[in-house]
Structures are given as C-alpha cells and as structure tokens.
C-alpha cells in the first residue's frame, strides 16, 4: 500500500451545501471516493490509499487536472484505490463533486 496526499489552492468554492458524499466501490480495478465539505473555500485536499505502488506522478497529473477543471474549494477527498485506471479516477472524482453539489445532507 502507498499513501499519497495532495493539497491545492483553488479558484472557487465547490457548489452545493451537502456536507459529504461517497461514490464508487473498492473492487477489482476500481476505487471509492469519500468527499467532505470541511476545508476553507480556497483549499482542496486529496488523500489516497492505493495498492498500486510507484504511480505518484500519474496521481499528481490526474489530481492536478481535476482541480484545474472543477475548482473543488472547501472539499477534502479520501480515496481508497484498488488499482483504478486514470480515466476511472477522473470519472469518480467528477461524480463526487456532482454528488456533493446535490441537495440533501
């Protein structure tokens, strides 16, 4: 297992008022993303636990692209990865942002 952490300043607060959401499932080749609205509006944090050791630079690129596209201000993401491909990671992060922007608790 490898633990990775990324912190990014962001342009804007993520939409919505929902406090948390979870998307995905840890299974063969997939990942689970928990997103929580717990940070200041100008910050984003992403913590990753992955079984795929040695892919830190790939994660850095995928996370950097995600933050640039979505500006997820105020959100902390906790990822449990079972070996997902970069496109699946991007999809799950986008789903997490959409989920937390929905109405509800």
Curated annotation (Swiss-Prot):
One of its GO terms (cellular component) is cytoplasm. It is found in: Cytoplasm. InterPro entries: Mal_deCO2ase/Cit_lyase_ACP, Malonate_deCO2ase_dsu. The modification O-(phosphoribosyl dephospho-coenzyme A)serine is found at residue 28. Its main location: cytoplasm. Belongs to the MdcC family. This is Malonate decarboxylase acyl carrier protein.
